[in-house]
Regions:
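Secondary-structure boundary elements
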Residues: 6-90
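Glycine-aromatic micro-motifs
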Residues: 2-3
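Hydrophobic/aromatic-rich core segments of domains that either
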Residues: 100-139
Length: 139
């Protein structure tokens, strides 16, 4: 079980296609030469690359928390399960799902990143940690 929480996406190409960035489209958008093979996902680890990935993910994968209201469905935070939900079945997810899968994509692409818990602050309150965000360190 724990291993599934830190797995890489089963199919990086399918994930990139889900967010509208087939590998060749991504490389063209970044003005890079096309790779020698269709499974070469090497990209520069720059702010521009990261911005393109973040924008594509936000534009193509909606925030949704529908599964949390289904008493007969268990929400899994394992990467293969999240991948199936978001990439294969083309659904959205909530912050823990979206950020876990996006972090896994970034790691698969060679970015240095880690997860942290966050609070949603409202004036006059100090609530518990209830959200997951991804911190990316660029060279």
């Amino acid at each position: 079980m724990i291993k599934g929480l830190y797995a890489l996406p089963p199919d990086v190409g399918a994930y990139l296609a889900r967010i509208g960035l087939a590998p060749e489209d991504f490389r063209r958008a970044m003005h890079l030469e096309l790779p020698p093979s269709p499974t070469d996902y090497s990209i520069p680890h720059t702010k521009e690359s990261l911005d393109l990935l973040v924008h594509a993910h936000l534009f193509h994968v909606p925030f949704e928390n529908i599964d949390g209201y289904d008493l007969h469905r268990e929400v899994s935070l394992e990467i293969p399960d999240i991948f199936d939900k978001i990439v294969t079945r083309r659904r959205g997810g909530y912050c823990f799902e979206l950020n876990a899968l996006f972090s896994a994509l970034l790691e698969a692409l060679g970015f240095s990143c880690y997860a942290v818990g966050q609070r949603v602050l409202r004036e006059g309150s100090f609530p518990p940690v209830s959200h997951r965000v991804t911190v990316v360190t660029l060279p």
